[in-house]
Amino acid sequence: MAKERFDRSKPHVNIGTIGHIDHGKTTLTAAICTVLSKAGTSEAKKYDEIDAAPEEKARGITINTAHVEYATQNRHYAHVDCPGHADYVKNMITGAAQMDGGILVVSATDGPMPQTREHILLARQVGVPKMVVFLNKCDVADDPEMQELVEMEVRDLLKSYGFDGDNTPVIRGSALGALNGEPAWEEKIHELMKAVDEYIPTPDREVDKPFLLPIEDTMTITGRGTVVTGRVERGQLKVGEEVEIVGITDTRKVVVTGIEMFRKELDAAMAGDNAGILLRGVDRKDVQRGQVLAKPGSITPHKKFRAEIYALKKDEGGRHTAFLNGYRPQFYFRTTDVTGSIQLKEGTEMVMPGDNTEIIVELISSIACEKGSKFSIREGGRTVGAGTVVEVLE
């Protein structure tokens, strides 16, 4: 089995195919798996296996996504492909499948289309750092001048959304040709993966980022002090280090006097651990669910921010009606709901269920957040939308 050969010592990168409907995203995903399977670093996948994407839930929203994995000489990749446009929007905004980079698929027969633009904008908003372009269907649109024009158009489009359009690699190929085993087109898949290897940066591992733990619960241990519990979101923490309690009340620094996991004492807690953190000189009433413990200076509390949001459709459990300027739902960050008001961008009268749009949010109390923080929008405990912080304002 090809599966045995995955080498976990290679750097891991999360990637995804984006682009307009029917431009060949899923065919390309299948082609990458199939071509790399011949080199023994992937399992061959048929189009239908990828297209029948299973449902998953993220932040209370159902999304269809297909996950495949493959490796090149240099890296291990987890690749996400979504069957429908709405799934892409939801996926990017909820961060259900984190993307460290994207493969933008554009058909050479059509050029950039409305969803091409929308996906580029979303990628920009949610912080996808770089993309590689695959100009697909070059076996059909085989006029080099036409391909040249489409390539220029894509580069200009990338530039208009703040990507480096001049230096973005553009590979001209045919996903279907490669899937059918035509050597010239298979070579283009190798060329694409080489560009992805070289152009898309390796992300920092979660463990190497500044420490952050969202507080889920607090308790007092007689004679020892206050313990907060939660799952470490990123970074690592050692006994004796200082952390800040951020959000809701004024930020304060405290010293960690103990770390426990499954009733065992530890020297350190790392990303992914569910841990209890013992804090020196803190009263239980001074800490609460919804705050975070963080490396001092790494994250600050904010009340006002710009965000990109998706409003759930009625059949997804969302609202039945549009919401207007001044709408006041709850914003669920990590472990808690905070009420806030929504200001729509100029020229937007209302937000209909199923829309995605940019808004400004003002919360009633400050919460630890930064560019890229994810949240749900809730109304009486049910999720009616999801969002990503694009920029903190105050």
Curated annotation (Swiss-Prot):
GO molecular function annotations of the record: GTP binding; GTPase activity; translation elongation factor activity
Residues annotated as binding Mg(2+): T26
Keywords assigned: Cytoplasm, Elongation factor, GTP-binding, Hydrolase, Magnesium, Metal-binding, Nucleotide-binding, Protein biosynthesis
Region annotation (G4) ranges: 136-139
Residues bound to GTP: 19-26, 81-85, 136-139
InterPro entries: EF-Tu_GTP-bd, EF-Tu_GTPase, EFTu-like_2, EFTU_2, G_TR_CS, P-loop_NTPase, Small_GTP-bd, T_Tr_GTP-bd_dom
UniProt protein name: Elongation factor Tu
Organism of provenance: Mycoplasmoides gallisepticum (strain R(low / passage 15 / clone 2))
